[in-house]
């Protein structure tokens, strides 16, 4: 997981947010 990844956060916010 990472800021520029859409693993967990990317599902909710986007690929980089």
Swiss-Prot record:
Q: Which domain of life is it from?
A: Eukaryota
Q: Name one GO cellular component term.
A: extracellular region
Keyword set for this entry? Amidation, Neuropeptide, Secreted
GO MF term (any one): neuropeptide hormone activity
Q: In which tissues is it expressed?
A: Expressed in abdominal perisympathetic organs and abdominal ganglia.
Q: Which GO terms describe its biological process?
A: neuropeptide signaling pathway
Localization recorded for this chain is:
Secreted
Modified residue Leucine amide is at which positions?
17
| Family that this chain belongs to | Belongs to the pyrokinin family.
Query: In UniProt terms, what function does this protein have?
Result: Myoactive.
Q: From the Swiss-Prot or TrEMBL record, give the protein name.
A: Pyrokinin-5a
Supply the source organism's classification.
Eukaryota, Metazoa, Ecdysozoa, Arthropoda, Hexapoda
